[in-house]
A protein has these predicted regions:
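Generic recognition of stable, solvent-exposed alpha-helical segments in well-folded globular domains
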Residues: 18-20, 75, 113-116, 133
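Short, conserved, GDST-rich strand-edge loop motifs in beta-rich repeat architectures
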Residues: 2, 11-25, 79, 87-90
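Beta-sheet-dominated scaffold domains
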Residues: 17, 87-117, 155
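Short loop/turn segments immediately following beta-strands, especially the blade-tip
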Residues: 28-38, 83-95, 141-152, 163
Length: 182
């Protein structure tokens, strides 16, 4: 298993990425009795359906994080997807892939980090998302207010690579956030 993430909305729920054979996500509820496994509830998912009805079945899940809006961010061998706070994970395998507008006048967009291996995800105090990839460094994403029918949009604040920063490699294995300064 990978890193265990305690759900901030309900600390009895633990999110556990499975990294080996039959990769997926396990959601474990210990019902307040962590030493008694007999009353635990376990939910396992290895496939999700995105907002366009496409099947998402990553070969590997490398990272998981929860932002301050309670959205779950999942980094995989094929990119990333989110599980919005409104999704009941116990009964649904719904997810969303983030679409970044091309801003070229076509009205089209591309999936954020589509087919890019995402090794690390961290959320800072300002609810910015730091995403570490296997080949293209670190992306810093932030929320902006939107005039669309959604409350916010996501934009790239910065993209750090070996060419424009002091990163020793574009293969990012982990990201740590200094809590007091972000």
């Amino acid at each position: 298993a990978g890193e265990i993430m305690v759900d901030t909305r309900n600390p009895q729920w633990k999110w556990i990425p499975i990294l080996r054979y039959n990769t997926g996500l396990v959601l474990l509820q210990d019902k307040g009795t962590p030493t008694n496994s007999l009353d635990d509830e376990v939910i396992y998912r290895r496939e999700w359906i995105d907002q366009k009805g496409h099947l998402i079945a990553p070969e590997f899940i490398y990272s998981i994080a929860q932002d301050h809006n309670n959205t779950i961010w999942v980094g995989t061998s094929k990119g990333l997807f989110i599980i919005p706070a409104t999704v009941d994970y116990a009964t649904s395998n719904a997810c969303e892939r983030i679409i970044i507008p091309r801003n070229d006048g076509t009205g089209l967009g591309d999936y954020l980090l589509d087919n890019e291996q995402v090794n690390a995800i961290a959320i800072d105090g300002a609810n910015r998302i730091w995403i570490g990839t296997a080949t293209s460094g670190i992306y810093l994403m932030g929320f902006t207010e939107s005039t669309l029918d959604v409350d916010y949009t996501l934009e790239t604040i910065a993209h750090f690579t070996t060419e424009n920063s002091l990163l020793p490699s574009d293969d990012i294995l982990s990201i740590a956030i200094q809590e007091s300064t972000g």
